[in-house]
């Protein structure tokens, strides 16, 4: 530090750049402090010196009014170099804006970043309030938990009892208190977010409420009568979102995969519960209480395993068993709360390699993609049935696993060969067993005669109308139906994707084409080799392909593999069937048979559930399907097959190039091209370019290349007027012929040429050599010369004209011309006089 030569000086520094955007006060403040002066951040009465440069007019006026010494930055520098207090009158400050009118007050804005001050409760009032609010909330929670909290409990006989005292282990709150204490000590600016609490619960399981023990008897937890289907969560007690709670449960369960039962480490404890509630009595005595405890959101939109809302369509795509997921992670217990009454659901792990699945129908929850007005009733009733513990329903040889859960489903190993037999044994919920829709589609358990009678009972009146999702068996409660064995032992399976209630007939037609008949109709085929499908109205616009959303995950691959083969066979076989309809009418019923039996390789058979061969049959209930639909169906499918193979539509052959255009206009052009179609955007002019759009009439390389190739050189207004008209309008009135006279001439020559267009501008000129140091680049300049009919040599000794600066030995017989000669000649569409473009020798 220098000697305190300015110890009596109290300075106020205001030094700005001349344009008022940069504040340089800090540099001079440091120098003044080093010399012993005091620097004030505000202009107060103690200030004796003002270091001023291009500052505020108000500061200047205030300094003059108070008689404070106004000095320039040179005074500070002179004091520093001289090491003494220099006379202030030698370096007076200047105010350049003093005599200018101050009508427009320019706002000063410093572009330098501000110093970052770390927020603590001491220097930030908002953080202090938040800190105090958290502390008060913690104190209130501790007070309410330490006191006597009366609660209502269900006794084993189903009656309500009043428990005067219940104390819950407050490990969660002690963790919060510990966190606040750490914040007080360290003065951290972090609040305990949910992610931190989740991490804390993973590190120390005893500090998480989800692992806080609640004394429900081990017999209730491990018995076969334990319930699994009430999708409530700990949100009412814990305060966490469903997502955080599910993540915490998942983390806890993965750590305990080695143990046979992870329930024992996750038992929630209460001090004064004398007997475990009987879930059978809850089902019998108080079903209304269970209904009231299930929220509407929970009924209609159940959560999946990571806490997000699962819509019915998403459940269809991912609708395989919960057991698959929970077997994988060794069964994390499912927690439920019904107004203070806590339930823990658990299932014992099966000892066998294959999972044992419940084969009675009432345990399988229906899929919610059936009728929407029944969605609430259908989603509640199976959950109530899950609470039943009657002994007559327990027919399990070993430790039985509970039924599937619609809300917490996964399809991790649904296609595993171990699960094929288990999926065959799955039955359907009793609600869906209606007279018009036979519920069981197991072809092995029904004779051919029985299947024929069931088929005759089926109602085909809905064919051709606006289709609803069929009530039959809730589409076997799976997106992919279980493989059905036929009489001859040949395995057949079908995709049963479901369309929404509002799907129109054309959309369903296309779905039927691409997904091998996704709309299952009621009844089984009399031949017993698959299911019956409906082919809807084939009058479908061809541009409808992009409206379909494929299924998720593994189902997407299966759908594409089966759907593509199905569409190909459907077109060909339908045509054959239509041509031979007269011959076959005496032997068979008149029907449009579309056989989708496709040979698969051994590897594909394994991937597609042991061989995906489906039979799609259509009953002749609509004569428009019979009369002329086969040929139109074939024509309809062809473009979709091509789109399926290529993955996207065919690109336009014409390209459009933009030049001298700001990004805002470029974005508008791109949007208009996307809307009106017919063009693709290219960065540079190429063989396919037909239009060059110029935002300003500047001679750019793209404009010159567009002229040389005979393209339209248009103004930006052409795009705007085309957008106004809704289609591409005529280009003549928007051509930039005034600025580029050669453009319309070359364009007409291009239109009149039979083959690929090549100009004749430089056809009569001798061989040229383009210098490597030329500007524009050599490649572009050579391309321009070549497009205009000129000949370009790679070596200078063969050329009679050298374009661009040339540093080698010059010959008297060779013309050394500037690059502008080529550019001006192309622009004017005539060879300019070379004398005006000669380079100095």
Curated annotation (Swiss-Prot):
InterPro entries per record: BRCT_dom (IPR001357), BRCT_dom_sf (IPR036420), Microcephalin-like (IPR022047), Microcephalin_mammal (IPR029504)
Gene3D superfamilies the record matches: BRCT domain
Residue stretches of biased makeup (Polar residues): 433-445, 565-583
Residues with PTM Phosphoserine: 278, 286, 295, 332
Intracellular or extracellular location(s): Cytoplasm, Cytoskeleton, Microtubule organizing center, Centrosome
Annotated keywords: Cytoplasm, Cytoskeleton, Phosphoprotein, Repeat
CDD domains: BRCT_microcephalin_rpt1 (cd17716), BRCT_microcephalin_rpt2 (cd17736), BRCT_microcephalin_rpt3 (cd17751)
Modified residues (Phosphothreonine): 334
UniProt xrefs under Pfam families: Microcephalin (PF12258), PTCB-BRCT (PF12738)
BP-aspect Gene Ontology terms: cerebral cortex development; mitotic cell cycle
Coiled-coil zones: none
Domain BRCT: 1-93, 646-736, 757-839
Keyword Nucleotide-binding: no
One cellular component (GO) term of this entry: centrosome
Top-rank taxon: Eukaryota
Stretches the record annotates as Disordered: 340-375, 417-445, 481-507, 562-593
Stated role: Implicated in chromosome condensation and DNA damage induced cellular responses. May play a role in neurogenesis and regulation of the size of the cerebral cortex.
Domains (record comment): BRCT domain 1 is required to prevent abnormal chromosome condensation. It binds directly to the SWI-SNF chromatin remodeling complex. BRCT domains 2 and 3 recognize phosphoserine/phosphothreonine marks on proteins with high selectivity, and mediate interaction with phosphorylated CDC27. They also mediate the dual recognition of phosphoserine and phosphotyrosine in the C-terminal tail of histone H2AX.
Subunit text: Interacts with CDC27 and maybe other components of the APC/C complex. Interacts with histone variant H2AX under DNA damage conditions.
PANTHER family for this protein: MICROCEPHALIN
Record protein name field: Microcephalin
Originating gene: MCPH1
